[in-house]
Amino acid sequence: VGYVGEGFYINGNLQQLTIKVPIEFYGEAEVIGFTQYVYGIINGFPKSYDIEVVIESRDQIESFIYREAGDDEPYFHIFN
């Protein structure tokens, strides 16, 4: 799985990290499982900046995960 990350810095400090994960899925269960996996990984990132992960297929966004700086748990949404 490849991914592309983009960081937004102010005065050398990371404020927001956006990660796009392009992937091809073959069913809803794969989207759910992969989203859960990435959700768990995000909990290991520092909480000092906003982080968003967009999991997308060729045609559409499959799921979205977002955690605001300082929050303990990310928010996620899986699109139908």
Where does each model-flagged region fall?
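A generic structural motif
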Residues: 23-27
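A short amphipathic beta-strand at an alpha->beta junction
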Residues: 45-67
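Short, non-transmembrane amphipathic alpha-helical segments
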Residues: 29-50
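Surface-exposed beta-strand edges and their flanking turn/coil or helix-capping segments
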Residues: 17, 32-34, 66-68
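Short edge beta-strands and adjacent turn/loop segments
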Residues: 2-22
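Detector for Asparagine
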Residues: 11-13, 43, 80
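Short, low-order "capping/linker" segments at domain edges
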Residues: 61-79
